[in-house]
């Protein structure tokens, strides 16, 4: 005899299934609403204006001569622009026959952007804003009510210089390239790099703080951007057993070497109009003959030396311990930006030279007269000033309700 399910039991089972389905539908609706109106969305970076923090579409070729890996950016790439790319030059050694393959074009980084207006951002936060050309990503530099100014690459707020916290400086590894004639390395705080624009390639300066370049590289080209003022470079102390360093600091220059007793020895000379080297040339050890010396105990074999040109000072650290610190001369006295380019001198072809230098650096933003921001106005800058269209160009004011939070500096979806 077949059993019969009572009607109330059947109804309860149907009710449970119905409630479960309704709950699933509600959860799906809430999930859709969240992802449609509240959850961050993924956006691609389309330009080089935030390099090296965020990269747009680019190639990353390796120079067959010196082995340097570098970036070739494509701003707002089009098939015609990509097809026109054939060869580029290495920014380190100058080798000019490096091919570009359209199939090897890398996509731009992706970021997660909030859908709602950002809470009041802090200085140096990365934010996104919709513009005529699409979504742009920049860095907050000026806050409402402040007076902002750019002097020789440095941001001034209400008349005082402002630098990023060192924890937010970019970090790069730079390859070294030995120059046979003469036997020395000239390390500057800028590097030209190629950007594809219009019909072909144009030269542009990418503000890395130091890199190797021929001693004949001009230091004051008419259209050259401002130099980077804040950077630090770290290398093993034993590096100084075979080489010596020269640092320019505005109207003065320093020679850094290791004594036979393995003490750090600094010699300083003043760069008067008569003694200052011509543009594009470098000082040599003979320029420091008879200069006053300063010495410091230095763990030459096991330690690391850090040279820092930051916060308007030139400083030397040994494993984090400050050895020397010298304030930069006022700009009004020197008539030139204080950039601290680094020159490495050696007479031995077998001298130990690190294959790479670890560099941390801030960014120079050029020059702009003082500007007072409104009560709800923000001042935005790109990390690659030479390729960034930002608040320096004026135009519409940037308001808080236009900004969106970039919740991750780089997020792959």
Where are these regions (language model features)?
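Extended hydrophobic leader/signal-anchor segments used for secretion and membrane insertion
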Residues: 2-413
